[in-house]
Structures are given as C-alpha cells and as structure tokens.
Amino acid sequence: MIDRYKHQQLRIGSVSPQQISTWANKILPNGEIVGEVTKPYTFHYKTNKPERDGLFCERIFGPIKSGICACGTYRVIGDKKEDPNFCEQCGVEFVDSRIRRYQMGYIKLACPATHVWYLKRLPSYIANLLDKPLKELEGLVYCDFSFARPVAKKPTFLRLRGLFEYEIQSWKYSIPLFFTTQGFDTFRNREISTGAGAIREQLAGLDLRVIIDYSLVEWKELGEERSTGNEWEDRKIGRRKQFLVRRVELAKHFIRTNIEPEWMVLCLLPVLPPELRPIIQMDGGKLMSSDINELYRRVIYRNNILADLLTTSRSTPGDLVMGQEKLVQEAVDTLLDNGIRSRPVRDGQNKVYKSFSDVIEGKEGRFRETLLGKRVDYSGRSVIVVGPTLPLHRCGLPREIAIELFQTFLIRGLIRQHLASDIVGAKSQIREKEPIVWEILQQVMQGHPVLLNRAPTLHRLGIQAFQPILVEGRAICLHPLVCKGFNADFDGDQMAVHVPLSLEAQTEARLLMFSHMNLLSPAMGDPISVPTQDMLIGLYILTSGNPRGICTNRYNPWNRSNYQNERISDNNWKKKEPFFCNSYDAIGAYRQKRIHLDSPLWLRWRLDQRVIASREVPIEVQYESLGTYHEIYGHYIIVRSVKTEILWMYIRTTVGHISLFREMEEAIQGFCRARWYLS
C-alpha cells in the first residue's frame, strides 16, 4: 500500500470484503462497475484474445498493449482532446499496459470459505479464538457436522424434538436427504448452521475484550490452584494456561491492528493481477501457464456450479448442495495452500500444482528471491580473508572490484581534473588501467564508505559500514574482530559489497553503521567485538611458550631443554638462555632469526615489589667473582650486590609474550590519551 505521504510500504494481514471490493472494482467512464471474474476462461482459442469477464479480461485488468483496446483501436494515452478515454464497444480503457501488474480482480463466492492459513496452520487462530478443538471445526467447515442454531428467544424445532443432544452432531445421514434445495435453505437458515458460514457467524459474535477478561480470570484461577499430585492433571493445567496466554495475545493483536475475526472467512476471493500469473507462448506455439491460473479455474468452475444450484434448480437434494459447498472450500484451500489438508492436487503429468503459498514462501519465493534477493547495482561479491594489519573500521577492497564499483565517481574525477576530455576517454583510461587511474581511485575512495553484508542478515550487525582501501588479490580483507557480528569465519565465507550513493545514505552509514560504532550486541548489550576463532588460536600460539605444557615453561636447571636455543644461521647449540636489556633487542634478535617466537629468554625488567616480597624460595643461586649473586626463581632472576641490595631483575618470557604486552600497552596508553582529551 502507499500512504498519503507517498511512502511505499507493505503490510500483510486480513482485510474486509469491502476493502477487497475497493481494490478490485473500478468504475468505467460510462458508469459500469467491473472487477468480478465470473468465467474460468483465459484466452479464446481462435482469436488468442482474453475472454470477457475471464481471468485475463482486459476490461477488468487493463489492456495487454498500451493504448490499444480489445477491438484493436489505438488512442494516445493521456490525450485530453480525445474523448472518451475508453472504447465504448469493448469497454477497455486506453491506459498503460503496466496496470496489469497491480490491478486486481475478485471472485464472489456463492458460500463463505474459511482461509486455510488461519484454520490449519498451527497454532490455529480460529480454534484459539473459538476455544474449540480443531477437529470439530474442520468437520464443521467441510460439512461433516452442523450445530443447532438458536434464534433469539425462540426454541428451534431440533432442540424441541431433542434430536441434538450436543451442540455438534452428525447430519450426513439424517437431515439433508429429506429436503430439496429451497426447503433445505429455509430449514438451514432457521434450524442449523454448517460450513464456513457457521464459523463466520461464531467469529462475528465474539467480543474480543470479553475474551481477554474471561481468559485472564481463568488464568488467575488456574494459577491459584495447588498441585493435584497427578502429573497428567498438572500438565493439563499447564497446557491450558499456555493456551489462555496465546488467546489473550491473539485477541490483543486483533484489537491493535483493527482486524475483525470474521475476516478470516472469505466471502470475496481476490484474483492476482495477470502479470503475476502469466501465460507465455513458447517456440512452436505451445502455451505455458502459471499453476495459479489452473487453481483459479477450479475455484470458478465449482463456484459457478454451486451458484446455479442455489439460484436456478429447485429440486436438488440438500446433500448435493452441501457436497458442492465442500468442493468449493477444498478448491479455495488448494489455491491458497496445496496439500495442507490432504494429498496435494496434481496435473496430468503427475506434477504438484504450485499454490499461492508455494509462490511466496521459501528461498525461491516471491519475497526472498524477487524482492529481497534481487540483484543490486553498484555491488560486488567475493571471499573474505583476514587482514591483520587493518584498523577495525577499514576493509581491504580488491582493485578489480573497486574500479567497477567506483567507476562513475572515477570518471567524474578524471574529467574534473582534466585528465580526460569526455566519458569515452575516461573509460578508455580505466580499461587500460593507467597509473593515474589508481591515484584518482584512492582519492575517490578516501571519504566514501562501503557496506559489507553477509547472508543471512539475521540482525542489525549482519551489515556494517567500512572505509575501503585498495589491496592486491581478489579477496576482501576484513579485521577479525568484526567477524562475530557477521557470524563469519575465514573458511571460504563470501560477503557482498554495496556502495551507498546518496549523501543521506553515506551519512547514515558513517554515523550508525560503521564497525567501530557497533561494539556491543544490540540484543544483549554484551561486547560483540571480542577475539574469536582465529584470533584465539593466534594468541594461544603467541603465548604458549614450550609446546609440551605450561609446567615446562618454568626454569629448571635439570631440564636440558632449557638450554636448547637453536641459532638457525649456524646450527650451534647455546649452553645458556639469552639475556636482553630491553624488548627492542629481543624483537630484533627474533627478526634476525637468532631465536624462535617461543624460545625462552631473560628480559631485564623494572623492579616489581610484589614479586620481590613473595616468599618463594629460589631454585638456584649463582655467585660471581665480584661478590654479586643471582637468585634464580621459576620465572624471574633477582641480581643482588655484596650488601644484598637489589640491583636489577630479569623475567623469563618469550618474544610472543613481549609482542602481546607491547600491543596491549600501546592500546591502554592510547585509550588514556583519548580519555584525557575528552575530559
């Protein structure tokens, strides 16, 4: 629907018969109202033109060719000089043929038909509101049962005679055989009610607010009851309480959306626009038709037969009328959801007909494939790989993708800087990939964010904004901390890239969708940018030390593995673990391949009173000739003078630990500086 502010929106729900009639009916310039489809025909076999009042009627749905009526007369669309703007002979308006994409029709049902989605889908909304078993309602809808109808303050014949002990009774072999069509109609209108009309009467008589009040009272009474000690009874009470909660929620939803319960029973059946259920002529003259057309034909055939029985024939047994009403109900069920009640209806080639539910649901349905999953301009797709050097808000975009996505902006940049005379020259430079093109591309991308999306987009963090930079290769580089929001990993996952074009879209992406602006989960409030998967494995390897376990990382003078520090250049074995005065020397030795990433080493460290004051006994004490001595512990060494004063200390660590500590220290210092600037 389109509101008064011209905002296009879609709302799915039940509508009244009056609303369906308003959508489908249109008044021709001669005052004639058209919109009802009464014939089950599509095209005439001789003229190949749509049948009048059929499923493809041009009077109802509009002309097949713009400005050409069914007679072949041509008029200019929108020309006010030509009057009238429709053909008086065939009744077709001279309008654009695109009207056949949205102009609806309707079928006036001879008897009400229950919407199978509200009856058979679990939980059943109709059974919930009426508080009756689903099997009894199904028997009522499909004319297997009926109930006695009480007339206001007047006893009915059936209740006086006591034929119906309960409200629901079988009538198949007792009542309708004794009445003709006219007599049975009179009898049914006063005494009994059956079919979808009975459901509609009960739904129309509901007061939703009374249902809410009664359900709340019953729920409180059940909550006050103590446990009976019988497990079966306790479960029964629990299920009843859950049912009452669902009933209250459903009634509140109907009140909030201004939907009447009786709208779940159809009196007018909408007919889709013809362009949404086309008939296509293949090579060789063979016609291919949508399954929806055949299902509509079944409904119209059976509905017309029932209408003839009710209006023309006066001697038809009531059983035949009830049987035909059941056939109409089953035809409507098949149209809406084929196979939901029984075995699905098949065509001559034993192929199941695709009903309306099959057309719109699933991955290949109308919404997910055509509306949500359709191809988008200025977008690309590629595999994601880790970008360990990227900031959190940046992503690496392959040159091949970037030059295509930003081609329009790139052409404008080349022309503005007088590097190309026109669009043709700019495209030629882009095609030849001249060096100046990459410089202009970097300038264009510098302030233009891109959107990365990973399907399925189940929550807000499934699509985020990044500042792109050019990278080599054909894969998108991504910071590993943003993977949790996307639920992605680097085992072959793909992501789509979208370029926001308008200034409004770019502003929204920069203010609301940037990855560094979405650090917390919108659902739970927990941190979402936390190390996972690859980062955890990398941190473990970086800080694991000895691969044989954490206990072997302690200094042990009797463990020869403590002295096995291999120098890769000359393959010599050093007898002592190396000592370094600062972290820069240790990292330099690692870059020169003198030590491994997990090789134990001794690093001179600032004095830590918490370590010194501990009561740990040294493993070994080494004395030097000048009187100084070294107290060697499991993870540190204290160097003391002759007077037992502490001169300095060394800690036992690895290059991996040093690298992690430096990164954490820089991050904390940067955070403190940012906090100081803000304060």
Swiss-Prot record:
Annotated GO MF terms: DNA binding; DNA-directed RNA polymerase activity; magnesium ion binding; zinc ion binding
Record's function text: DNA-dependent RNA polymerase catalyzes the transcription of DNA into RNA using the four ribonucleoside triphosphates as substrates.
EC number(s) per entry: 2.7.7.6
Subunit description: In plastids the minimal PEP RNA polymerase catalytic core is composed of four subunits: alpha, beta, beta', and beta''. When a (nuclear-encoded) sigma factor is associated with the core the holoenzyme is formed, which can initiate transcription.
Full protein name: DNA-directed RNA polymerase subunit beta'
Keywords on record: Chloroplast, DNA-directed RNA polymerase, Magnesium, Metal-binding, Nucleotidyltransferase, Plastid, Transcription, Transferase, Zinc
Catalytic activity: RNA(n) + a ribonucleoside 5'-triphosphate = RNA(n+1) + diphosphate
Required cofactor names: Mg(2+); Zn(2+)
Keyword Magnesium appears in the UniProt entry: yes
Species this chain originates from: Oenothera argillicola (Appalachian evening primrose)
Domain of life: Eukaryota
Record bears the keyword Plastid: yes
Positions with a binding annotation for Zn(2+): 69, 71, 87, 90
Family in the record: Belongs to the RNA polymerase beta' chain family. RpoC1 subfamily.
Signal peptide as annotated in the record: none
A GO cellular component entry from the record: DNA-directed RNA polymerase complex
Cofactor annotation comment: Binds 1 Mg(2+) ion per subunit. Binds 1 Zn(2+) ion per subunit.
Major enzyme class: transferase
GO biological process terms on file: DNA-templated transcription
Places the protein is found: Plastid, Chloroplast
Amino acids binding Mg(2+): 489, 491, 493
